[in-house]
Amino acid sequence: MVNKMKWRRTHYSADIKPEMDGQEVIIMGWVHSIRALGKIIFVILRDREGTVQIVAPKQKVGDELFSQIKKLGAEDVIAVKGKVIANEKAPNGFEILPLELEVINTAKRPLPLDPAEKVPAELDTRLENRFLDLRRPKVQAIFKIRSEMLKSVRNTLYNEGFIEVNTPKLVASCTEGGTELFPISYFEREAFLGQSPQLYKQMLMATGLDRVFEIAPIFRAEEHNTRRHLNEATSIDIEMAFADDKDAMDILEKVVYNAFVDVYENRKKEIETLGIEFELPPEKFDRITYDEAIDIANAKGVEISWGEDLSREAEKAIGEEMEGLYFITDWPSEIRPFYTMPDEKNPNICKAFDLMYKDLEISSGAQRIHLYDLLVENIKKKGLNPDGFTYYLEAFKYGMPPHAGWGLGADRFTMVLTQQENIRECVLFPRDRQRLTP
Amino acid sequence: MVNKMKWRRTHYSADIKPEMDGQEVIIMGWVHSIRALGKIIFVILRDREGTVQIVAPKQKVGDELFSQIKKLGAEDVIAVKGKVIANEKAPNGFEILPLELEVINTAKRPLPLDPAEKVPAELDTRLENRFLDLRRPKVQAIFKIRSEMLKSVRNTLYNEGFIEVNTPKLVASCTEGGTELFPISYFEREAFLGQSPQLYKQMLMATGLDRVFEIAPIFRAEEHNTRRHLNEATSIDIEMAFADDKDAMDILEKVVYNAFVDVYENRKKEIETLGIEFELPPEKFDRITYDEAIDIANAKGVEISWGEDLSREAEKAIGEEMEGLYFITDWPSEIRPFYTMPDEKNPNICKAFDLMYKDLEISSGAQRIHLYDLLVENIKKKGLNPDGFTYYLEAFKYGMPPHAGWGLGADRFTMVLTQQENIRECVLFPRDRQRLTP
């Protein structure tokens, strides 16, 4: 175990090629496996980009280095200075002949979870030992794809003229209604954790910043315990002025489509590691109305009346019928939040949309109400008190342009891109009713 | 007031050039000012990218449109279809002859804060009416520069092989010590809001993800009320494995330098709007030791003994002496957090650094302790109980590589880039002891 490392890494495993035969490299990582066969030892070193085989014949490396290597155990952290030896039979066409070894840190054994194990442990055990679970290439692949997706989303939004903002997560009053909020003790006062940046991004539409986005945590004190919900999530939020629901849907299509393309082009190795069939969606997604959606559900034997929110069963029935990504539009005003703009001709329906992937809702958006009187009326209609919305409502009095926006769940979008069934697979340290650690 | 807009914007004000003489455009924004001089009306329309002059001679626009325009008031939201008329005497060399007007929304008057006013109101009034305050180009410029900075920071980190992560803000136990935490009621349990992603990003160093970054809110229940502190802030955090403090400082220099360059190159207009002298820093920043720093302070008559943290007075004295950006290194171990790696030769000092801009600390970092026994010993030495760190400590038992990292305050960095004296100028909706709204 060392306090100060002798070297710096010169190459990740994936950067070494057989053509580098004879070249000296320094590699660093974890002992993925070690096998001593008499006078030769095989060590597989694992780093972020893959694995590399180190072959140490006693005769070539000498007694001292040989016995040093022999003492290594699984998951020890090592640095190896060695020579690249092209070898057609070795994995990736080369192996490393070690010249010098530094044991950087050792691993206690047995491990509570073995990263080299083929059969994965139960999810709960894995989450308890997330730092070991994350050593498995399949698990790391999910988070590399997630990072790529976030990068792609921001690039699309920058290109579309959006400005990044940070809105507060500590808020004074119960807002929006609907979802439960977590209360905080804020000095002498009570405050709450923001369930979404909705009211703030709308207020920003009155500023002339025009197009804003934020990627940040949201907090929902909902009691349900499903494979699609967490109490802390990462939300990709946009809001755009001088725009309607159709404009917002166009941006959402670009964001989602480009993320698929960027993951496909830049994360081929991770897609392969996950062993998934990765297909690019069309550039434009199907659009069905709420009416059509409930017709599909009813036709499949799931009873649902007009005006009801889609039950889990209805979502599943519709998801079976629809392929990949699709919008559901023209929702009943009754079941959408107070700030949703009603349709001009038929105020019973509104300019809201959900973006679905099969049976999973990944985004929700709408054109919002920008007219003060209509907004106050709608707040009251939902049984809420306009007095709780003073600051928000102020922004609608002095020149608020029409605007629209959406929230896209980063965790759920990662589920779609990596084809995971449980949202906990796509969050490093998930938070649910039961789990608040690590 | 309209529910559905007739048109979409074809050009922002800044996109229109005198060479477009005769071309038809649709512009949208707020009535910045209106002046009727008998049979001619001048309207200045303001959008995100600037202002444009609309000139409406009664004789040319006709009675109906003329009287429509005459009724406009300050801060009404309008769309104008008009013709570009090159005119050397007009601002930017052109004006717009209106052909058609749509009043999209009206503004109640008087305004609680006038965006067109030359003399700004008190900060408190401005923050109360932030949506109006943000209509002022000088205020918007700060947030455009902030967005540019965040984009630049991420680009540098992507280029340096960092992966973006999201760590939880809801945490189970009082961690780190030092700063006060906000308690949350989490279903049946008590939880806390994360004061920094420190322990999580360190745990991730045991995973092999190697280089991670996160830009996210942090929450500190500190009681002080200064121009440099907020209770909710945005922190840019990185952590890198197989690295020491010097490696982390190199990355920090690149991140900060590149952000200066990107703001300088891409936000010239905003720099001009702010009226600031914007100078690029050198690529490498000066480095002084803590010992040298207290010598400077003492020489300037600020009494400070070795082992004390730098007082505000000491920071000011040192800031007067040092120019621009500089590191302070080799801090006494006593005054740095428990996870800071002590120096091999002299454990009284440690591998910590602060990045200062004049008298403002904008970043703090260190090589961390990766050795389990030393870490436990240090936790105890600081009077903390290792039992409170179970999950964190587990990650150090099974192969933790040496690692280093830093946190860079996004709000403070924005202060530096925009030359603001109060952190509240650089946060859309600041949170302090007194302010929890809007």
UniProtKB/Swiss-Prot annotation, chains A, B:
Record text on cofactor binding: Binds 3 Mg(2+) cations per subunit. The strongest magnesium site (Mg1) is bound to the beta- and gamma-phosphates of ATP and four water molecules complete its coordination sphere.
Catalytic activity: tRNA(Asx) + L-aspartate + ATP = L-aspartyl-tRNA(Asx) + AMP + diphosphate
Protein residues bound to Mg(2+) 2: E361, S364
Spans annotated as Aspartate: 198-201
EC number(s) on file: 6.1.1.23
GO MF annotations, alphabetized: aspartate-tRNA ligase activity; aspartate-tRNA(Asn) ligase activity; ATP binding; magnesium ion binding; RNA binding
Site (Important for tRNA non-discrimination) residue list: P91
Gene3D superfamilies attached to this UniProt entry: Bira Bifunctional Protein, Domain 2 (3.30.930.10), Nucleic acid-binding proteins (2.40.50.140)
Binding site residues for L-aspartate: E176, R220, S364, R368
GO cellular component, one term: aminoacyl-tRNA synthetase multienzyme complex
PROSITE patterns: AA_TRNA_LIGASE_II
Domain of life from the UniProt record: Archaea
The protein's name in its UniProt record: Aspartate--tRNA(Asp/Asn) ligase
InterPro entries assigned to the protein according to its UniProt record, in alphabetical order: Aa-tRNA-synt_II, aa-tRNA-synth_II, aa-tRNA-synth_II/BPL/LPL, Asp-tRNA_synthase_2, Asp/Asn-tRNA-synth_IIb, NA-bd_OB-fold, NA-bd_OB_tRNA
Oligomer and partners: Homodimer.
SUPFAM superfamilies: Class II aaRS and biotin synthetases, Nucleic acid-binding proteins
UniProt-listed GO biological process terms: aspartyl-tRNA aminoacylation
Positions of Mg(2+) 3 binding: E361
Keywords of the record: Aminoacyl-tRNA synthetase, ATP-binding, Cytoplasm, Ligase, Magnesium, Metal-binding, Nucleotide-binding, Protein biosynthesis
EC category: ligase
Cofactor dependency: Mg(2+)
Organism ancestry: Archaea, Methanobacteriati, Methanobacteriota, Methanomada group, Methanococci
